[in-house]
């Protein structure tokens, strides 16, 4: 909303609330403003005219990616400095020219060991959880990866505190992928990958949605031929370690390797001990069993 300086109590709605578009940031410039957010779990950047409030949404070339504004310190500009990356595209900084949409690449993250993006593919899958909820999955593999269930897969998820897991570039994954693995990110409930409701649907009394989503994604990837039961590696730390503890007990036959780093697996006793310095601040996430 906006208001005139002389009438600060009178607000005009500029950008209405939306269940589809999850606003994460905005930036103001002289002739326009820019909104950043996610729709269906994918980053969206929109340039909006002050006078008409019409929006131009920028297009990005890959099915799964991370995109947004970079450093733009000037107020009166004709170009926007932006950044883009994906699971197969190293971090790229470019200028977007407002007049005609031309994109000038300024810098691409250097990979000292060498990297040929043409050898790899990234996809965005939708796998249906047991309650009918569609779960987005970002996946990376070599282009010659066979969908016959013969290959191992590394599956990552977090699903807590409203933290989205972005499908960005990571050099450490390439070693696994070059040795025949697929690498997948399950955008499970408990993060805010698809907005605040996505986060709320994976906390408190709905916490089991997070665990079920992760297991169902693993089973869905098996059904699609990306891997087989017993060939999935996974890991998680802290709240992600809690996820590891849950899934290795509920479906032990799915996993070939599970690493739980500093896992938060004694939730009940921790939430019952209010003398622990972190416990009261964690009650909104896990619940307060002392009172309820």
What are these regions (language model features)?
Residues 179, 185-292:
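Active-site-proximal cap/loop segments of hydrolase catalytic domains
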């Amino acid at each position: 909303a906006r208001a005139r300086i002389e009438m600060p109590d009178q607000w005009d709605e500029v950008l209405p609330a939306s269940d589809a578009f999850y606003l994460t940031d905005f930036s103001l410039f002289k002739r326009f403003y820019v909104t950043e957010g996610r729709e269906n779990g994918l980053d969206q950047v929109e340039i909006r005219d002050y006078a008409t409030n019409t929006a131009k949404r920028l297009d990005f070339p890959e099915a799964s990616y991370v995109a947004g504004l970079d450093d733009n310190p000037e107020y009166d500009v004709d170009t926007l400095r932006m950044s883009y990356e994906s699971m197969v595209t190293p971090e790229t900084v470019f200028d977007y020219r407002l007049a005609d949409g031309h994109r000038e690449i300024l810098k691409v993250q250097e990979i000292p060991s060498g990297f040929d993006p043409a050898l790899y593919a990234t996809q965005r899958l939708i796998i249906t959880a047991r309650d009918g909820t569609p779960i987005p999955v970002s996946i990376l593999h070599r282009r010659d990866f066979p969908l016959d269930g013969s290959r191992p897969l590394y599956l990552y998820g977090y699903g807590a505190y409203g933290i989205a897991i972005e499908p960005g570039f990571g050099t450490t994954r390439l070693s696994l992928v070059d040795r025949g693995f697929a690498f997948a990110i399950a955008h499970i409930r408990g993060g805010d990958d698809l907005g605040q409701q996505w986060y709320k649907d994976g906390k408190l009394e709905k916490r089991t949605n997070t665990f079920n989503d992760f297991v169902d994604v693993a089973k869905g990837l098996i059904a699609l031929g990306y891997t087989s039961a017993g060939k999935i590696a996974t890991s998680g730390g802290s709240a992600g370690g809690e996820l590891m503890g849950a899934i290795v007990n509920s479906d032990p036959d799915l996993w070939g390797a599970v690493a739980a780093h500093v896992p938060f697996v004694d939730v009940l006793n921790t939430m019952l001990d209010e003398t622990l310095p972190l416990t009261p601040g964690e009650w909104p996430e896990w619940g307060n069993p002392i009172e309820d």
